[in-house]
């Protein structure tokens, strides 16, 4: 399996029973699953309170499976600068954490209510040394940080995640509060997120901060970064990049066909009005009911260099979105208005505007309108 398939298989199975998760692990492979979970655990571990680095051995155990495989040890180095990890055991570990692979996968990728540490054990090398009671060694907080990540006890906000991962969504832009307002119901779901625009322009190594931010925020999510340039260097577990052109409907349709149903689209691409309209017109129909389509940096809709204008021209990004507001009330138009039906009239359920930022919700909107006698009166 490739990385997106592994991620989808684990996330989907973790939403079912433990038997489903065990079967998924068998399909992926025990060592491969352990490596995937080690990457996830390292990425979620918060180290801001760590003062001294320490190494911890984490053993991914499979003893509870009917056809148990050998345990898989990994080594984590937890320090003030972050977390690194590698396959293999330590010769003389200060601490050994052991946990069932299925249980840990379900804790990391399943619903919050299904988290468990019932199979976990922690062995301390110096447990019989009375000095550790008065002078705790660095391995103590290192283990605590890893377990906090495994148990979901660290829930960072988007502003902090944006700063940590180098996303521009907080700072000059102050989008994170609006994102948290609208994305909160999705945070514990197995969502598919598509962001147009990886960042860094043509530099294959630059950008990617927002993709990593979304990965950390949506702990069960799969994140796809779409860019006209090759950004494959930013691929990692649960983050995939795709080369596509947001101005080309065929390119976007191929993208949607490959990804499957989408829950959230974030357009942080070229910001050229024609491209924004094309991307919305192509991808909004592929959005799941209840999903959100987000358009960033709407200030460019007023700038001629981005095909913008100051009026309500529907060819601009803001003008196009204003037309969607009319579509919300499509059932209230008098027949004499002669308003042509739009493809989005019955599928846009709400719009939310913030400075330079808009959220469009996909939801059935097939109301019959108010009292026709009053609507048609002159």
Swiss-Prot record:
Transmembrane segments: none annotated. GO terms for molecular function: metal ion binding; methyltransferase activity. Mg(2+) binds at residues 268, 296-297. The active site is at residue 271. It comes from the Bacteria. Its cofactor is Mg(2+). One of its GO terms (biological process) is antibiotic biosynthetic process. It is an enzyme of class 2 (transferase). Its EC number is 2.1.1.305. It holds the Pfam family MycE_N. It catalyses: 8-demethyl-8-alpha-L-rhamnosyl-tetracenomycin C + S-adenosyl-L-methionine = 8-demethyl-8-(2-O-methyl-alpha-L-rhamnosyl)-tetracenomycin C + S-adenosyl-L-homocysteine + H(+). Pathway: Antibiotic biosynthesis. O-methyltransferase involved in the biosynthesis of the permethylated L-rhamnose moiety of elloramycin, an antitumor polyketide. Mediates the methylation of the hydroxy groups at the 2'-position after the sugar moiety has been attached to the aglycon. Belongs to the methyltransferase OleY/MycE family. This is 8-demethyl-8-alpha-L-rhamnosyl tetracenomycin-C 2'-O-methyltransferase. It comes from Streptomyces olivaceus.
